Amino acid sequence: MTNIRKTHPLIKIINHSFIDLPAPSNISAWWNFGSLLGICLIIQILTGLFLAMHYTSDTMTAFSSVTHICRDVNYGWLIRYMHANGASMFFICLFLHVGRGLYYGSYTYFETWNIGVILLFAVMATAFMGYVLPWGQMSFWGATVITNLLSAIPYIGTTLVEWIWGGFSVDKATLTRFFAFHFILPFIITALVMVHLLFLHETGSNNPSGLISDSDKIPFHPYYTIKDILGILLLILALMILVLFSPDLLGDPDNYTPANPLSTPPHIKPEWYFLFAYAILRSIPNKLGGVLALVLSILILMLFPILHMSKQRSMMFRPLSQCMFWILVADLFTLTWIGGQPVEYPFIIIGQLASILYFTIILLILPAISLFENKLLKW
C-alpha cells in the first residue's frame, strides 16, 4: 500500500512542501528566516485573536480596554506584550530574510521576490494600523501624521485623507476601520505567503553559492525540519527574554498617555522598524517628494532583478559587492538612528546624506561594481 502522505489530496500538498521537498544540501542558517517568519505570523494571529476578544475599538474605551487586558485578564499582560514584541521579532526576521535575498541573489526568482515585496508592504500596513489601536498619544499622532501624508497626492489628496479618516480628523471612525483592517490583513498575508511558497517551489530554493543545485538535493525532512526547530527555539527564547525582562524596551513611553488631540508630543516617531523609512521621508523638505521617497525606499526592492548586472548570482565570490552591501546595511542602521532623532542640526544633514547614499548604492554603485567584477573575471 502506498503511503497516505503521498496519495491523499490534501496531505500530499503538505508532503511536497515540508517533507519530501528536494532542498539544496548547503543552505545555511540564513535560510531559516522563512520558517521563522511563518512562526511569527502564527504567534501574531493567535495572540491577536485573544487580544481582540477583550479589546474595544472605541475612542472612549480603547485605552482602558488595553489597560484592562494587562491588569484583569488572565495572562493578558503576557498576550499583549507577546503581540507587541512579536511584531518587532517579525520585522527583525523580515529584514534579515530580505537581506539574505539581496546578498545571495534570490531576487532572480522574480515572482517569488515580487510577492515577497508585496508581503513586506502588507506587513508594514498591518503593523502601522496595530500601533494605532491602543489609542495612546503616539498611536493618535502617528496615525494623524502618516495618514496626512496622503494629502500630498495632487488634486485628490485632501478628499482621500478625509475618506480614510471617516471625518475631518483621526477619530472614532478611523479607529474602528483600522481595527477591522488590522484584523483581516494577517489572513490576507497568510494567503499571500502560500502564493509566495507556491512560486518558490516552482523553482526550488537558492543556495549560498548561487549555483544550480539540482545534482545535489536532500529531502527537507528530517534535515531542515530539525534545523528549523532549532531556529524556532532560539526565536521563542529571544522573544520571551524580551517579553519577560524588558517588554517596553522597544516601545514609546508616550503611548502610556491616553490620546489627546489638544496636546502634541514633542517628538512624533513611529516604531523602530519604520524609522529608516521615516528618516528618508523627513530628509526631503517637500511633502510630495518625501512621500515618493518613502514609498520608493521599499518599492526599489522590486528593481533588484533588473539592476542585477553580475554574471554571478550570489555575492559569495564577489568581495567588492560584499563590501558595498555591508555599507548599505550600515547606512540603514544610520537612517534608523536618524529617524528617532529630533529634526535639528546635525541630524538633518546626516539624514539627507544617508538617504542619498541609500538610493545611490542601489541604483548606481552596486550595478557599476557588478560590471567591474565581470571585467575582472577575464583577467
From Swiss-Prot:
Q: How is the cofactor bound?
A: Binds 2 heme b groups non-covalently.
Recorded hits in InterPro entries, A to Z, give: Cyt_b/b6_C, Cyt_b/b6_C_sf, Cyt_b/b6_N, Cytb/b6-like_sf, Cytochrome_b, Cytochrome_b_C_euk/bac, Cytochrome_b_N_euk/bac, Di-haem_cyt_TM
**An example of a Gene Ontology BP annotation on this entry?**
mitochondrial electron transport, ubiquinol to cytochrome c
Binding-site residues, heme b b562: H83, H182
Q: Where does heme b b566 bind?
A: H97, H196
Q: Could you list this entry's UniProt keywords, alphabetically sorted.
A: Electron transport, Heme, Iron, Membrane, Metal-binding, Mitochondrion, Mitochondrion inner membrane, Respiratory chain, Transmembrane, Transmembrane helix, Transport, Ubiquinone
Look up and give the membrane topology term: Multi-pass membrane protein
Q: Where in the cell is it found?
A: Mitochondrion inner membrane
Q: What are the recorded GO MF terms, alphabetically? A: metal ion binding; ubiquinol-cytochrome-c reductase activity
Q: Where does a ubiquinone bind?
A: H201
Which cofactor is essential here?
heme b
Spans through the membrane? 33-53, 77-98, 113-133, 178-198, 226-246, 288-308, 320-340, 347-367
**Which Gene Ontology CC terms are recorded?**
mitochondrial inner membrane; respiratory chain complex III
Say which domain of life the source belongs to. Eukaryota
Which PANTHER family does the record associate with it?
Answer: CYTOCHROME B (PTHR19271:SF16)
Similarity section: Belongs to the cytochrome b family.
Its function, per the record, reads: Component of the ubiquinol-cytochrome c reductase complex (complex III or cytochrome b-c1 complex) that is part of the mitochondrial respiratory chain. The b-c1 complex mediates electron transfer from ubiquinol to cytochrome c. Contributes to the generation of a proton gradient across the mitochondrial membrane that is then used for ATP synthesis.
Q: What else is known?
A: Heme 1 (or BL or b562) is low-potential and absorbs at about 562 nm, and heme 2 (or BH or b566) is high-potential and absorbs at about 566 nm.
The entry describes its oligomerization and partners as: The cytochrome bc1 complex contains 11 subunits: 3 respiratory subunits (MT-CYB, CYC1 and UQCRFS1), 2 core proteins (UQCRC1 and UQCRC2) and 6 low-molecular weight proteins (UQCRH/QCR6, UQCRB/QCR7, UQCRQ/QCR8, UQCR10/QCR9, UQCR11/QCR10 and a cleavage product of UQCRFS1). This cytochrome bc1 complex then forms a dimer.
- Its recorded name reads Cytochrome b
- Species lineage: Eukaryota, Metazoa, Chordata, Craniata, Vertebrata
